Amino acid sequence: MARQFTLEKTRNIGIIAHIDAGKTTTTERILFHTGKIHKIGETHDGASQMDWMEQEQERGITITSAATTAFWKDHRVNIIDTPGHVDFTVEVSRSLRVLDGAVTVIDAQAGVEPQTETVWRQATEYKAPRIIFVNKMDKIGANFEYAVETLNQRLGVHANPIQWPIGAENDFTGIIDLVTLTAFEYDGSPEEKGKPIPIPSSLQDVAELKRNELIESLSNLDEELMLLYLEEKPISAEVLKKAIRKATLQASFFPVLCGSSFKNKGVVKMLDAIVDYLPAPCDVAPIVGIDEKNKEITRLNSDEEPFTALAFKVMTDPYVGKLTFFRIYAGKVNSGSYVFNTTKGTKERFGRLLQMHANSREEVKEAYAGDILAVVGLKGTTTGDTLAAEGQTIVLESMNFPEPVIEIAVEPKTKADQDKMGIALSKLAEEDPTFRVFSNHETGQTIIAGMGELHLDIIMERLKREFKIQANTTAPQVAYRETITQETETEGKFIRQSGGRGQYGHVWMRFEPNPGKGFEFVNKIVGGVVPREYVPAVQKGIQEALAGGILAGYPIVDIKATLFDGSYHDVDSSEMAFKIAASMSLKETKTKGNPVILEPIMNVEVVTPNDYVGNVIGDLTSRRGRLENQETRANAIAIKALVPLSEMFGYATVLRSNTQGRATFIMQFAKYEKTPKSITEEIIKQRS
């Protein structure tokens, strides 16, 4: 089957925003207007097409990124609708990794919110061009100019309206297109695409002023436009559109549109903007990877190049089994083809190729550069792996994911569910790189760890619904870590003689702090005092010992271990003896390395009416919070603070009580910090 849409006529975009800004409703309207669905489902009714998981429909939030494909004006638009809740930020990150551009949705009344800043930062990391849709213009308190101001102030970007609203709140009736200087009126019916009307006389001067501001702003980024502007020549819609596209693709300019997705106002114009201003795969830089010799390899966005793709998501489908979502950067692939997983060095066979629409699917036989699809049948491929044509060695840059910060113990209610639970949790961990499963060696309990209480709530619900496993959980625990703060040299010597062959392993290690770099092992042995074949055993012995901690049994992080001396016995030395000797040397750091316990510190932002600011600040301070910033937003005050996670359990209830239910808060991981001495002593006491 030949390619249906050229690369120039393809768009790969994400819908990103703070929770409740209207991302999923916006996506639903896009699907309706492009003919992908024929009945609009509402998020608040639990009938959204894109929020297909039961938990999403019940809670009215997006939990997992959902992919779909729509068609508009001879273009194929691949869309990924992403979550807005901070616990599911990883879904945004891995989606943006494979997308070429994004629509950022913001609330016209709230403007830029905390999670808007997070997803914007993620999109900036991936250099994704964006257009901005100021949604909910019909909402009480909607203020387009305020929303645009927050974009420039809080995000520090060059955002400029290319549309202007006609009215606001209940009086929001239409938009003015500043590029063409035409106006459109909406009656709110689902089929309404906007009726052309003359620009209202009360807004004629405003429209001309805002168009001039748009031209002036763009002229600093576009030479052709600058010459026309300086010579005071008329600037046509075509010239202006071309300048907007060019600056948007460079991510130096962000066009701002407006509307109300729920009331079907402005969505069609946003679809036009996606096609007009966001990049095609051939507009972005060729993908760069490395080969087995660490040399750079470039792949052009072309069907003629060798097949190169990135797996960005794994999920289990109840009907077809394990699905691997991937983006093709170069070349083409057929169902049934053999490909090479260059990250893991394994061969894989593509089963069925599927074009996804949320959780429904359409089978295709062939896929091309620029396509985003799912495939059935990959056995060992996980998120971040590179897939390439056989014989190719290119490895693309993978993805980095944050460490979990909260954990709970899980116990099945029946013995029969014990094995089933292990398999189910492994499947869920395969899907979600920020979810971890491990065993507590002291208690034998199964521990699950994630990004927040909601994250783990969803995992437990999925365990119950999808895998039919009933389980009990403990109260959430903080995922503490340990590290050393002082360089030290320690000896580990393991000798055992019990008739016949004995055991002998002996190492001298240098341990030093390695802030932010994780575990690093260096072999500095000279002269063979520790034979080469035992060095991997030394490294493994230390790595295994790191998991058990030295102060309170929490994993040790950010440590550099250098093997510099030791000895061996011709007969009695073994890998096991050197593993044990290495772990003994690590335990010595308890007295010599000045070890400390690290706790997760959270960025907390509380938005509260002015009347309750004192209550909120007092409470945050009592939780060992450090106030960072305070700013006025619309009719409220936003308070930013750094607070230890251990102090934040149950905060939602207390905040509700302190502010009569009128404040909201958002919390996300910031960093790990050393615990105060009194807290350290308390933690060690509890663990012992």
From Swiss-Prot:
One of its GO terms (biological process) is ribosome disassembly. Signal peptide: none annotated. GO terms for cellular component: cytoplasm. Keywords: Cytoplasm, Elongation factor, GTP-binding, Nucleotide-binding, Protein biosynthesis. InterPro entries: EF-G-like_DII, EFG_II, EFG_III, EFG_III/V, EFG_IV, EFG_V, EFG_V-like, G_TR_CS. The keyword 4Fe-4S does not apply. GO terms for molecular function: GTP binding; GTPase activity; translation elongation factor activity. It is found in: Cytoplasm. GTP binds at residues 17-24, 81-85, 135-138. Residues 8-282 form the tr-type G domain. Pfam families: EF-G_D2 (PF22042), EFG_C (PF00679), EFG_III (PF14492), EFG_IV (PF03764), GTP_EFTU (PF00009). Belongs to the TRAFAC class translation factor GTPase superfamily. Classic translation factor GTPase family. EF-G/EF-2 subfamily. HAMAP family: EF_G_EF_2_B. Catalyzes the GTP-dependent ribosomal translocation step during translation elongation. During this step, the ribosome changes from the pre-translocational (PRE) to the post-translocational (POST) state as the newly formed A-site-bound peptidyl-tRNA and P-site-bound deacylated tRNA move to the P and E sites, respectively. Catalyzes the coordinated movement of the two tRNA molecules, the mRNA and conformational changes in the ribosome. This is Elongation factor G. The gene is fusA.
